[in-house]
């Protein structure tokens, strides 16, 4: 069969889109166009990707909901030394509560001001650019532990690859695969990684078929 000779191993539906008359398309031409298609796979639109990679934008009701944190968590800040560490920790916890992921030390100023007011800190004393990576990593562990989540580590990657592999066998629409693996990781209480990790995972698996 034609597909037995095509090293790019792409699904038949794409081939049918490229040409309605298979006898007029060479194996090499199909592989070239299929390869070009795979190289240009785009799952989320630019706007969707930016939204996924950015902290949530809350309205006033959502802000109260997600930044109303349990006493056991807010009490953790008593041992933190600086206003920046205290506020950034609580904002990070609120973002995680809403989205099950962290946002690489990105914070909306309105959220910093809201949390600062809650705990009696002057917002001007909060400097997110001085919230260092090591402190942020320690805070992530506290937040993950409180919410009962695990980080997206090597074991999580193996699990995600297995799940995506099963999805790719029955679903060729990459966006649906992405949305589903997000739900699977959330149900397993695994913190979501960034978009590029999921994008690479899915496209690598798709390219194997």
Where are these regions (language model features)?
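Long amphipathic alpha-helical coiled-coil/heptad-repeat bundle
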Residues: 30-209
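Cysteine-centered motifs
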Residues: 6-8, 19, 31
